Swiss-Prot record:
One of its GO terms (molecular function) is metal ion binding. This is Arginase, mitochondrial. It is an enzyme of class 3 (hydrolase). L-ornithine binds at S73, D92, S93, T94, N95, D185, L186, Y187, S220. The gene is ARGAH. Mn(2+) 2 binds at D181, H183, D266, D268. Belongs to the arginase family. Residues 1-15 form a transit peptide. Binds 2 manganese ions per subunit.
Amino acid sequence: MSTIARRGFHYMQRLNSANVSPALLEKAQNRVIDAALTFIRERAKFKGELMRSLGGVAATSSLLGVPLGHHSSFHEGSAFAPPRIREAIWCDSTNSTTEEGKNLRDPRVITNVGDVPIEEIRDCGVDDKRLANVISESVKLVMDEDPLRPLVLGGDHSISFPVVRAVSEKLGGAVDILHFDAHPDLYHDFEGNYYSHASPFARIMEGGYARRLVQVGIRSITNDVREQVKKYGVETHEMRTLSRDRPILENLKLGEGVKGVYVSIDVDSLDPSIAPGVSHHEPGGLLFRDILNILQNLQGDIVGGDVVEYNPQRDTYDGITALVAAKLVRELAAKMSK
């Protein structure tokens, strides 16, 4: 069991040993969750009203942080990522214009809702199933406010399941997913954890929340997971076939006949020489330009996305991976907004 998971588990043990009334605990959990959702609701409402008053925008990328790291099977520092990524987005080392010419100083391109208070919710003894529901509800609150679209900052990759579920349920149907990662994240469960960061896309596919799942950068895959790939009809593009697959990947057309496209970027999809600040180093990965070429050429309406698995605790002293993650967010935000 991970350090952060143990902390939550031991806290619940202390509550149980203190004979805390289940009714009292449930009431406390409900109040804290209501307060958390009220915060997200009011922040999203304000940002939505602001975008509508400015006018001339059909979609605004809305940053929602989900600082959750306890479902990681190794290092857990991704829980500390959202504020570091936000800081790097506005770092003075670069200007505010994206490669496609959008000015991030224009709030109609990118805005910020804030973070779901994951640690505070878990501190009340809320279990993983209910926590996932809180994440889903938070995403829906953002989507309630047209023209906001969720661009979620992880956190480990487990967050993609409740986020994609929310997007699909809110839009009333499945989406297509473009997924950059070193790992397929398709385990049915990992070491008994149904909500592991190694399992989100199994949850998504079995729930019918995605029609197509296109994975890019895969280079660590077990035979059991290959069976999962076959089971769910996943389109997996491994690093060993990247040269052959590049023409296909740089001309992707997704989202037709479904509710749009969701883009999930695990920072460990990149080679660790480019992005060392991740929990799981897997040599032989994508170059930064590989991701941008695929993303910038993607045809389809992007209705949501996430950038996950940046781990500040494993980054270099000057935060190079934070800058890498921030640029991924910047360029994805530019692609989403219109």
